[in-house]
């Protein structure tokens, strides 16, 4: 067994930064919670997903997403360059594998904000990851948030609500559930789950 410097002790496995996956239905506030947490604790590395979706107003390539064509996404998938990928509301999303593994090997806390399908893929390939489900305070509140965005046509909102029912039913598959009643409180709880504090 390797010796440790005097006055220190090895970091117990449960105290090391780890891969934390945040998932939950569309409109539950995942992006808002993550943005708040990272504003206070930028040391938590958030993976930037690749997507075939068109950018929303204010979104920047390489900051919010890597916006790619269908052909580029096909290549990423075929070459095994994605840790996980999923199709949602007619668009594909995926997490670049290399950047995540490099951060984890460096001992940095990594956070993925992904959908249910992606969370299941991560669970299969990296069972040590902590899966966190972000739940809405109520179904009515989730509907209000989705329709209040005003960025998508009604048929897309209907697809998102149908998917939300499936995602809410999968909550027991997760290691932890956080109810988004307060962005600040949920961000603090999520931070604790990344083993940063």
Curated annotation (Swiss-Prot):
SMART domains in the cross-refs: GuKc
GO function terms (MF aspect): ATP binding; guanylate kinase activity
Region annotated Disordered, chain positions: 1-30
UniProt domain Guanylate kinase-like: residue ranges: 17-197
Enzyme class: transferase
Places the protein is found: Cytoplasm
The keyword Transmembrane helix appears for this protein: no
SUPFAM superfamilies documented for this protein: P-loop containing nucleoside triphosphate hydrolases
Entry's EC annotation: 2.7.4.8
Main location: cytoplasm
Keywords for the protein's UniProt record, in alphabetical order: ATP-binding, Cytoplasm, Kinase, Nucleotide-binding, Transferase
Reaction catalysis annotation: GMP + ATP = GDP + ADP
GO CC aspect terms: cytosol
Pfam families with a match to the protein in the record: Guanylate_kin (PF00625)
Entries under InterPro entries matching the protein: GK/Ca_channel_bsu (IPR008145), Guanylate_kin-like_dom (IPR008144), Guanylate_kinase (IPR017665), Guanylate_kinase_CS (IPR020590), P-loop_NTPase (IPR027417)
Binding of ATP, residues: 24-31
Function text: Essential for recycling GMP and indirectly, cGMP.
Family statement: Belongs to the guanylate kinase family.
Protein name as it appears in the record: Guanylate kinase
Species per Swiss-Prot/TrEMBL record: Streptomyces coelicolor (strain ATCC BAA-471 / A3(2) / M145)
């Amino acid at each position: 067994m390797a010796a440790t410097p005097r006055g220190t002790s090895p970091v117990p496995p449960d105290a090391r930064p780890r891969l934390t996956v945040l998932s939950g239905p569309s409109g539950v506030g995942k992006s808002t919670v993550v943005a708040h947490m990272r504003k206070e604790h930028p040391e938590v590395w958030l993976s930037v997903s690749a997507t075939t979706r068109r950018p929303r107003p204010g979104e920047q390539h390489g900051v919010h997403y890597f916006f790619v064509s269908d052909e580029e996404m096909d290549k990423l998938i075929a070459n095994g360059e994605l840790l996980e990928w999923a199709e949602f509301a007619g668009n594909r999303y995926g997490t670049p594998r290399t950047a995540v593994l490099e951060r984890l090997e460096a001992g940095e806390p990594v956070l993925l904000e992904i959908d249910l399908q992606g969370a299941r893929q991560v669970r299969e390939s990296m069972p040590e990851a902590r899966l966190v489900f972000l739940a809405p305070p109520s179904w009515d509140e989730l509907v209000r948030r989705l329709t209040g965005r005003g960025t998508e046509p009604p048929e897309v909102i209907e697809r998102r609500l149908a998917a939300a029912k499936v995602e809410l039913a999968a909550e027991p598959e997760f290691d932890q559930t956080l109810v988004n009643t307060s962005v600040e409180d949920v961000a603090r709880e999520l931070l604790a789950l990344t083993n940063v504090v």
